Amino acid sequence: MRCALLAAVSLPFVFTALPLHAADLSDLTWTTTDDQVTITACDRGAAGELVIPDTIEGNAVTSIGNRAFRGCDSLPSITIPEGVTSIGDIAFQSCTGLTSITIPDSVTSIGDGAFSRCTNLTTIEIGVGNVNYTVVDGVLFNTKMTLLHTYPEGKTGANYTIPDSVTSIGALAFWFCRKLTSITIPEGVTSIGDRAFEVCKGLRSITIPEGVTSIGDFSFGQCTSLTRITIPGSVTTIGDSAFSRCTGLTSITIPDSVTRIGKSAFAVCRNLTSITIPDSVTSIGRYAFQSCEGLTAVTFLGDARKAGGGIFKYATSTIYRKPEAKGWRSTWGGRPVKLISEKP
């Protein structure tokens, strides 16, 4: 079934349903289960200030599904009705015309990246009675402010300090926030979600605090201005593509707490010249250093490990090892192996 949002509504922030007929619902697709409606899609040609009805065919609208409004780039505002409890993953992704959105009191769950790539979204607003989420300076948090959910991509300012109460940075939280050059992460943060800072191309340096144990997949991928990053001794896992295409990085220190380096973790870090792999690392994923064209020296402080396929593809590295280390042959991962004493 398909249904349309009301266009050009002259009553902002009205959450009650306006009279609708089937002919007015041609832009939306929805499903109905147990008398509850989930909006699943919207025609990308829909334009104007749109109001989602609170009922469709006599059934309450309670959910906005994953990707429901993805790519609807001609909607400057969308009114979500009271009664909606769930907003799905990337539900409003790439709504590039959207400048503000208000989340009603009834919402209890907001999916990852729900407002990602909304390039003109400067603030997120929330109903004063919502007990699950709060907004501070336009940034979306859970009520206890332990989770930073979304930093709007269109928000102005080059510097941002994450509040001290935050312990988790959500997946896609700062995705594509290219205006930011500096982000301060407080000491209490223990979790950084997948793609949390991906494509923050203005970000120049960042310190990951002690207590973080895992750096999520793609979490700092394509941060092309990043020249310095500090990884603490609490980190055990560097996720897949965690620092891929960080072309500004020239060096990085991996602490001896790390046991796993994910696939493509440092791929296309073209200006990375050297790296030291501690003895603690037992697993290195395929393509981990692919296309690191400037990487001339990789020093291993322990025994030889199983190399993932293509680990040094398009790289010209030389491997250096300790003389007492075991399992090494004349080549590893397709690159020559020498003793550390032979290092230039």
Task: Give names to the regions the model predicted.
Residues 13-15, 141, 176, 218, ...:
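Aromatic (phenylalanine/tyrosine) cluster motif
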Residues 1-6, 95, 103, 107, ...:
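Charged, compositionally biased non-catalytic regions
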Residues 312, 327-334:
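Short loop/helix-cap segments at secondary-structure boundaries that form the rim of catalytic
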Residues 27-36, 45-63, 73-86, 95-109, ...:
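Structural signature of tandem-repeat unit edges
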